[in-house]
UniProtKB/Swiss-Prot annotation:
Lineage, highest ranks first: Bacteria, Pseudomonadati, Pseudomonadota, Betaproteobacteria, Burkholderiales
All copies of domain Obg, residue ranges: 1-159
Role description: An essential GTPase which binds GTP, GDP and possibly (p)ppGpp with moderate affinity, with high nucleotide exchange rates and a fairly low GTP hydrolysis rate. Plays a role in control of the cell cycle, stress response, ribosome biogenesis and in those bacteria that undergo differentiation, in morphogenesis control.
Positions bound to Mg(2+): S173, T193
Gene that this sequence comes from: obg
Protein name: GTPase Obg
SUPFAM superfamilies: Obg GTP-binding protein N-terminal domain (SSF82051), P-loop containing nucleoside triphosphate hydrolases (SSF52540)
Family: Belongs to the TRAFAC class OBG-HflX-like GTPase superfamily. OBG GTPase family.
GO MF entries: GTP binding; GTPase activity; magnesium ion binding
InterPro entries named in the record: G_OBG, GTP-bd, GTP-bd_Obg/CgtA, GTP1-OBG_CS, GTP1_OBG_dom, GTP1_OBG_dom_sf, OBG_GTPase, P-loop_NTPase
Annotated compartments: Cytoplasm
Cofactors: Mg(2+)
UniProt subunit comment: Monomer.
Gene3D superfamilies in the record: GTP1/OBG domain, P-loop containing nucleotide triphosphate hydrolases
Length: 372
């Protein structure tokens, strides 16, 4: 199935039915009085988070979703039937914004989370409500209220604990397939990965975390070059980023340090908060480096890159070093999970406050110095 992570739809709630201005007319009841019923309420539009859905493709082509109107009231104090509600099922991780006002309507973070996005109109009142001691035969009634109508922007931000960064062919897909249950397409050409892949890494009974692989970044990605920029939003919810570097590129003219610096630069240009996330350096493809050159090449890379954070040396293909990295990730996430959840909640609250005022991850990673 094609991966779609953005869509625009229109949701239209049903109008309320009109009240009835009816009089009771029966044999032997000369002054029956008013008996007009109320109109039914209009149907509302809800969204529900569903963990079994992983793309917004259903909403790329079905752009209008309408609930039914309420029925009009009738005589004999018969109320109109309420309109049926419409329920839209969306992936967990979907962010819903009102395109006209910029209001953040919902952030679907839990399975079965239900949110009202367009409220149906109230039904009108029948003339029975207007009966009084001085008005025994009222002819007044009210019309139903119109339902809400909204243009919504849907954005899917996958929910993962760990995100993978790196140039195309850095070995990200090989790594995620080696340590998790994900089975991404793997080949020796750039941009084999065209959509985010999620994998569950199981460390032990009841111990696991989710890792996300996005298409590789290239220089200029923040301005739209390549594929990775359109998927960087999927890393915004992660608690840890792994920066994978190909330490043994096939093209000897390629400088891994220059590529790594380009990735960091693109990350910073795209989103400063994403740049500030905890980030570990993972030097991959050590199996392609002669054993007597490995230490020299690793030390040279770290010095030229100016990196002072955690460093892991692995071979995703052979599995060398992967187990230690996985356990280190799990321990880190277990230690910082509460802080990361608090940060996500604060980010969401800040976003809401900002939008209201305008009308329209994890603890900070301390580094003495960072790569430029």
């Amino acid at each position: 199935m094609k991966f779609i992570d953005e869509a625009r739809i229109e949701v239209i709630a049903g109008d309320g039915g009109d009240g009835s201005a009816s009089m009771r007319r029966e044999k032997f009841v000369p002054f029956g009085g008013p008996d007009g019923g109320d109109g039914g309420r209009g149907g509302s539009v809800y969204v529900i988070a569903d963990r079994n859905i992983n793309t917004l493709i259903d909403y790329r082509y079905a752009k209008k979703h309408m609930a039914r109107n309420g029925e009009n009231g009738r005589g004999s104090d018969c109320y109109g039937k309420g309109g049926d509600d419409v329920t839209l099922r969306m992936p967990v991780g979907t962010v819903i914004n009102d395109m006209d006002t910029g209001e953040l309507i919902a952030d679907l973070t839990e399975h079965d989370q239900k949110v009202l996005v367009a409220k149906g109109g109230a039904g009108g009142l029948g003339n029975l409500h207007f009966k009084s001691s001085t008005n025994r035969a009222p002819r007044q009634k009210t019309d139903g209220k119109p339902g809400e109508r909204r243009m919504l922007k849907l954005e899917l931000k996958v929910l993962a604990d760990v995100g993978l960064l790196g140039m195309p062919n850095a070995g990200k897909s090989t790594f995620i397939s080696s340590v998790s249950n994900a089975k991404p397409k793997i080949a020796d050409y750039p941009f084999t990965t065209l959509a985010p892949n999620l994998g569950v890494v199981r460390v032990g009974p009841g111990k696991s975390f989710v890792i996300a692989d996005i298409p590789g970044l290239i220089e200029g990605a923040a301005e739209g070059a390549g594929l990775g920029h359109q998927f960087l939003r999927h890393l915004q919810r992660t608690g840890l980023l792994l920066h994978l570097v190909d330490l043994a590129p096939f093209d000897e003219s390629v400088d891994p340090v220059a590529e790594a610096k380009a990735i960091v630069g693109e990350l910073r240009k795209y989103d400063e908060s994403l740049y500030q996330k905890p980030r570990w350096l993972v030097l991959n493809k050590l199996d392609m480096v002669p054993e007597d050159e490995r230490r020299t090449r690793v030390v040279d890379f770290i010095e030229r890159f100016g990196w002072t954070g955690p460093v892991f040396e692995i071979s995703a293909l052979t599995g060398q070093g992967c187990e230690g990295l996985v356990y280190a990730i799990y321990d880190y996430l277990a230690e910082h999970s509460d802080a990361h959840r608090a940060e996500l909640a604060e980010d969401l609250a800040s976003d809401v406050r900002f939008r209201d005022a305008s009308g329209a991850g994890g603890e900070p990673h301390e580094r003495e110095a960072d790569a430029p």
